[in-house]
Amino acid sequence: MKVKTNYVNAPVWKEVNVKSRIPESLKMLEEMARNIWWAWNDEATEMFRELDPELWSFVKQNPVALLERLSYEKLEALCNNKEVLSRINHIYDKFKTYVNTKPDATRPSVAYFCMEYGLTHVLKIYSGGLGILAGDYLKEASDSNVDMCGIGFLYRYGYFDQSLSMDGQQIANYEAQNFGSLPIERVMDENGSPLVLDVPYLNYYVHAYVWKVNVGRVPLYLLDTDNEMNSEFDRPI
């Protein structure tokens, strides 16, 4: 069966600086949202869902997008709810105890390379079984406190969503990911500028930004070639 391809939203990005509006008493939510630990911790996932169940469904279970969209009134209500604050602090204490536990320095360190990682549906950098397996390896390495570092690629479009045309044909819809609303962070150099890796290819270089995903205790570094330094041919790498 032939599947048609449709890029549903070609992105036009502009750089902006956004100041967080999350109250101080809820700041720990931002830290937890930026670590994929919540993806395999039911208690943490349920905590985010209960902040605003309707909005949680709307943002497709993305805690970073959830916190960005919570209204001022909702944030104020959460700050004044002692039961909610107590639960958030309880889960945050468990999270900090988990991530602050150092690996056994006598065990060998591991560098894990893969083209895709299936960590959560929120981060579309996988397409099948290989990605799910790689994602599970990183999660298990985190739970087992293995000194591991993952390396991969950050894809702008990732895997596609399927829809049907009027005549019943399958259509592959590629929706661009907005990196600013994902549980990832840009890696900076010693001068505070975005870190760039220059990778030799044929007779020239491909330039890649570096992003970091916190997978519990395991850092995953992703290369991003979709930038103005590269040609239109190289940007989709």
Outline where the language-model segments fall.
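Catalytic cores of carbohydrate-active enzymes across secretory and cytosolic contexts
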Residues: M1-I237
